[in-house]
Amino acid sequence: MLFERAKSVFPGGVNSPARALKHLPSPLVAKAASGAYLYTDRGKLVDYCMAFGAIILGHAHPRVKKAVEEQLEKGWIYALLTEQEVEFAERIRRHMPSVEKMRIVNTGTEATMSAIRAARGYTKRDVIIKFEGNFHGSHDYVLVKAGSGAATWGIPTSAGIPQEVARLTVVVPYNDIDAFIKAVREVGDRLAAVIVEPVAGNYGLIIPDVEFLKALREETQRAGALLIFDEVITGFRVGLGGAQGLFGIRPDLTTLGKVVGGGFPIGIFGGRGEVMDLVAPSGPVYNAGTYNAHPVSIAAGLAVLKELETGEPYRIANEAAERLAKGVEDVAGRLGFDVVVKRMASMFQFYFKKGDVKTPQDVRESNEKMYLKLHEIALKHGVYLTPSQYEVNFTSAAHGREVVEETLAALEKSFQELQREIG
């Protein structure tokens, strides 16, 4: 069995924890992907994980494939400056004017780690504020959780992180303006930066209160600290201008990833010119990497940006998410399930609970076991939902009307089967 072989060479049998699918007997094994579909050891599945949001045009999109093939013909790594990466950065800046200068790295984790380092270098301060339920990668600065109280110095969420490092991060409830302002006052002149997912997409889908985001902007400016928008998920997913364009808020620094790499490894951190000019080689904030601005990732990302600039992929993906969100709400309601559905652009998630979902606490109060059971049942009916209520479902430009109808029919059967199982 492949999973047994995998467990003999990988911790837990996988190379990222989210792939473990612990509620199933074994993880899904991918064989191929095309358009809206995954081909796996469990058959052909309509994919709503979409590589946790990295794919927006659809799997193996022909124009992305062509761009990558053309790059491979010319070589795949030079460790030198290329014209393509300059054009790529110029396009990003055109759509996100706050990103005046940027550094292209390889992962979202690298991007947030480097953005925080740049903020500390610029402000000459050491403490950062992050928010409960926001995920910013797997580095020591941000793998922390709140202790007891509304705003607390961080506690490591992973073994191997020194307490002294975690104490440089203060964790505050998401969407809570009063708690945030209190934390800013308590940290005082040690506050280097506030990092936030402007739309929380790593604890389910939590839509921000716009006044909350405005308060982050106002208070960081007042405190002389930097505001970092982590748009690894939302950047070029919710629109060409990202969440910052959607809400009209200009952060000091931004991190990007996922969509802008076209399915290849990428991360970007960038923002105000005077901050980014502190990054090596023009300044003392160190960042370097053999694979930075990898030509294949740049080629794929450039192809994706050109497609997105037509607007058509957004129209299809957003319409699909809207129809699916309404469809889930309808079928769940008809069958007597208490379900809350949240959607933004081509992102959606649903929760088995009464009332709204505005905070991480609301997500925790949802019936996670019910979601996991539905996920398992939906696989039998040919639909791969995102594997946890703490993740987000994504649509793409490949999720046209026929795919959506196929999905809704399968989900109706899945909810009916769930109803029979719970009696």
From Swiss-Prot:
It holds the Pfam family Aminotran_3. It catalyses: (S)-4-amino-5-oxopentanoate = 5-aminolevulinate. Its main location: cytoplasm. InterPro entries: 4pyrrol_synth_GluAld_NH2Trfase, Aminotrans_3, Aminotrans_3_PPA_site, PyrdxlP-dep_Trfase, PyrdxlP-dep_Trfase_major, PyrdxlP-dep_Trfase_small. The modification N6-(pyridoxal phosphate)lysine is found at K258. SUPFAM superfamilies: PLP-dependent transferases. It is found in: Cytoplasm. Keywords: Cytoplasm, Isomerase, Porphyrin biosynthesis, Pyridoxal phosphate. Its EC number is 5.4.3.8. GO terms for cellular component: cytoplasm. GO terms for biological process: protoporphyrinogen IX biosynthetic process. PROSITE patterns: AA_TRANSFER_CLASS_3. One of its GO terms (molecular function) is transaminase activity. Its cofactor is pyridoxal 5'-phosphate. Pathway: Porphyrin-containing compound metabolism; protoporphyrin-IX biosynthesis; 5-aminolevulinate from L-glutamyl-tRNA(Glu): step 2/2. HAMAP family: HemL_aminotrans_3 (MF_00375). Belongs to the class-III pyridoxal-phosphate-dependent aminotransferase family. HemL subfamily. This is Glutamate-1-semialdehyde 2,1-aminomutase. The lineage of its organism: Archaea, Thermoproteota, Thermoprotei, Thermoproteales, Thermoproteaceae. The gene is hemL.
